[in-house]
């Protein structure tokens, strides 16, 4: 866990349940407060399969409330039938008023011993452990298939340098034993920590720990450290790191990114020497949509790597399994993932079910009201996941260096303002641009130029969305709001260590008359301006700073990135420039579709054709 609360459940979730392949999917609740005496909440799942074929499901049993720094035990349930039934709860490490948690189990296949690395800190009665938080790593083991456990042993001398004195977390989820390569047999778990000095947190550390003697002794290996500026900003904070072995014994790490200025809520790194060092610093994955939350990994065969995490870019909901076919560099887009539930959902772990059938077990937090309501265990097959998807429909992006944009749903063609346009029926249609470094607009001037047509009388209809989702995420968007009688554009920006700020402009009228209208949105000279059909611009002071920081980043036409707002209407000639176009250039675009001299288009979508192509 991190010292941050779960996303609040202040709006209803959609109906729960996997929408496809139900026959190959089954699940049940294994931890919930009303099913167990003495606990108010269960969180932080971790699961492994022993050499005897037993599944061990660990969790934090929180006695008084669901807060992160209360009286918390590490608890366990075992399954002897591949997760179809579970024996009663066992106590592995008692909190006794303090916080014992962050379970990171790993199995030594040679000896059958199960190692469990955890952390301990003084209980606060509730809330979070304030910085500097004294958290100590401990080690336990079981030699009888998880039935009994050794007393926790303090291993700070091996795994916690003296200056990692603020936050320290193991896992929380399973570690791995390397099955190939030079370091075959090595046990590897993940750690993240912070340094506190001079009255503030000064550094973040993402690390791997390993053991070559069956877990008796441990040492720190790969470490990636990121400094924190005096204003509290930093580029990255790799946290709650999931590990998986790639072919050849390489160690792949995918982590939660927590509030760094680099774009994205996930980042990754790779070790080529069994976890002793990282080949390069962590790299963020801006268009891998998740909220800020822990996620889990499982390698399925030689070429498929699974990621389990909520797929909403802002909120903890819609648990999804996404596949990577390139060793974790990229994962499926959210519109191509396998939905486990549309309920609120949070932390998770995965395990390969014994028996050689390729069945995957997913242990995850979820609930109809809050992601912390219960912990479920799901079983699914690769048939339920589906095979690797081929290239989908696309539409050309004529901006320099751009590839085609993916077309999702049933986007159709319509008579456009210049040539053909794209028609959206509100049923999940959209156009999604693949991430390129040129797309984020940063703190500079920009211009959005597009044609829109719609005739509906209610709802919120996105024309273009660039950036993240939510009140604090940097973003730029423009949409029609016919029920409010307006077209509305918004920018949210952040500068230095200040809180995000927003500026919005609205038109007098929704222009929902079923005719084509030209829209121009410009950031220039410290102002945000919006005009329709060349009329007088509505202008307000801009929100200072960058519109491209910290959050996930996506560019979508016809839908919000979380697909919870959709356009019923049509778009044509959508262009974005990384400068402010002049009035004459905008007039030429509006009147003759003439490309401005000097270009500077970061995206240029004629929307004249939709056909086969890469996505």
Where are these predicted regions, by residue range?
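Secretory targeting and sorting signals
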Residues: 1-11
């Amino acid at each position: 866990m991190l010292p941050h609360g779960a996303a609040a459940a202040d709006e209803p979730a959609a109906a729960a349940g996997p929408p496809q392949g139900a026959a190959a999917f089954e699940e049940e609740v294994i931890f919930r407060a009303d099913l167990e005496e003495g606990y108010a909440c269960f969180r932080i799942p971790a699961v492994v399969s022993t050499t005897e074929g037993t599944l061990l499901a660990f969790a934090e049993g929180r006695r008084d409330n669901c807060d992160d720094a209360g009286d918390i035990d590490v608890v366990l349930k075992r399954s002897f039938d591949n997760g179809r039934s579970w024996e009663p709860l066992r106590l592995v490490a008692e909190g006794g008023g303090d916080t014992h948690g962050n379970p990171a189990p790993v199995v030594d296949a040679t000896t059958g011993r199960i190692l469990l690395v955890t952390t301990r800190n003084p209980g606060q009665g509730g809330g979070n452990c304030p910085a500097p938080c004294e958290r100590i790593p401990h080690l336990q083991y079981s030699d009888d298939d998880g039935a009994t456990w050794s007393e926790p042993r303090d291993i700070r001398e091996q795994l916690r340098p003296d200056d990692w004195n603020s936050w320290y977390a193991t896992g929380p989820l399973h570690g791995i034993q390397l099955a190939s390569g030079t370091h075959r047999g090595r046990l590897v778990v993940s750690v993240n920590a912070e340094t506190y000095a001079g009255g503030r947190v000064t550094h973040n550390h993402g690390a791997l720990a390993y053991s070559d003697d069956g877990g008796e002794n441990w040492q720190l290996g790969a470490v990636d450290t990121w400094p924190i500026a005096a204003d509290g900003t930093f580029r990255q904070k790799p946290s709650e790191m999931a590990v998986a072995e790639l072919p050849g014994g390489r160690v792949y790490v995918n982590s939660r990114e927590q509030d760094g200025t680099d774009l994205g809520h996930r980042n990754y790194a790779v070790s080529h020497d069994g976890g002793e060092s990282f080949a390069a610093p962590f790299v963020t994955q801006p268009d891998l949509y998740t909220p800020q939350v822990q996620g889990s990994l499982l390698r399925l065969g030689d070429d498929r790597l699974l990621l389990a995490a909520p797929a909403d870019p802002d909120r903890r909901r819609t648990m999804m399994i996404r596949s990577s076919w390139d060793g974790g560099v990229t994962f499926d887009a959210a519109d191509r993932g396998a939905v486990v539930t549309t309920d609120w959902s949070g932390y998770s772990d995965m395990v390969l079910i014994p028996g050689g059938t390729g069945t995957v077990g997913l242990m995850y937090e979820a609930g109809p009201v809050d992601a912390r309501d219960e912990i479920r265990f799901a079983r699914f097959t690769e048939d339920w996941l589906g095979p690797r998807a081929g290239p989908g429909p696309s539409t050309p992006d004529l901006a320099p260096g751009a590839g085609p944009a993916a077309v999702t749903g049933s986007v159709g063609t319509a008579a456009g303002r210049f040539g053909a346009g794209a028609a959206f029926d509100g049923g999940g249609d959209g156009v999604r641009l693949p991430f390129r470094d040129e797309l984020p607009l940063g703190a500079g001037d920009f211009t959005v130029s597009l044609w829109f047509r719609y005739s509906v009388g209610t709802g919120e209809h996105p024309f273009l969305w660039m950036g993240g989702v939510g009140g604090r995420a940097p973003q730029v968007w423009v949409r029609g709001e016919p029920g409010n009688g307006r077209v509305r554009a918004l920018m949210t920006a952040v500068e230095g260590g200040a809180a995000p700020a927003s500026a919005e402009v609205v038109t007098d009228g929704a222009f929902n008359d079923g005719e084509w209208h030209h829209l121009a949105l410009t950031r220039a000279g410290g102002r945000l301006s919006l005009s329709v059909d060349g009329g007088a611009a509505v202008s307000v002071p801009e929100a200072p700073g960058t519109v491209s920081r910290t959050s996930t980043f996506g560019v979508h036409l016809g839908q919000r990135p979380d697909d919870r707002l959709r356009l019923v209407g049509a778009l044509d000639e959508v262009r974005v420039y990384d400068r402010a176009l002049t009035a004459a250039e905008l007039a030429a675009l509006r009147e003759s579709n003439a490309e401005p001299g000097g270009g500077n288009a970061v995206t240029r979508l004629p929307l004249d054709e939709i056909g086969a192509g890469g996505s």
